[in-house]
Amino acid sequence: MPKPEAGYRPPFNQTLVYGAQWRVFNAGTATLRMEQAGQESRIIGTADATGAVAVLYHVRDRFETFLNPTDFCSRNISKNAEEGYRKVDTTISFDYHRRKALLDQKNIKKKETKHTENDIPGCVTDIISAIYYVGSLPLQPGKTFSFPLNDGGKTVNVDIHVEAREQVKTPAGTYYAFRVQPEAPEGVLKNKGKLWVWYSDDAARIPVQMRGHMFWGTLTLTLQRIERK
């Protein structure tokens, strides 16, 4: 995996609060927070549908991941997903000694369990910590970075294209930001439409906006505020 930019300082103890927009609707809220946990870093994420969208499709997701803060190699990630009538708890542990990703999943509604093991290289990132990892890289328009990502199944190589530097206005402020597009030929990003993330062009490199063009419409997450504590 490409190394973080020299001098990068993780945005510890900052809760990033996002508002979600789908078509003309306020679709919900999401949060991201990174904090120190002993010798590791911990990232906590949430996503909740609200308003009319919640009536149409219930969403209440919770994520927690632990990683090595120097190289962003993921240690484990837990996901509690409530989406529609589906409720699934997932834990993925990365055993670098055995070079395996161990997935344990429990479908609460169906009372079914699943255990799988898949090969991994000497360092991988997960779907949540990858958001911060990309921000740690020396982003400049025209650059491309590649890294392995694992979400419990087969490890995939993700290509990150830095497309442009542009101004982004958010309720949290106006930022100059790098527009980044991730692509992968298979795995968790395949058939997900087109995705973009805008990272602030400053020392924090926080994701100030995220957008996905999917078959069911465009979903945009825009930074509303930063809670520092």
Predicted regions and their residues:
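Acidic, serine/threonine-rich low-complexity disordered tracts
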Residues: 1-96, 133-229
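Hydrophobic, well-structured mid-protein blocks that either form specific transmembrane helices
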Residues: 88-134
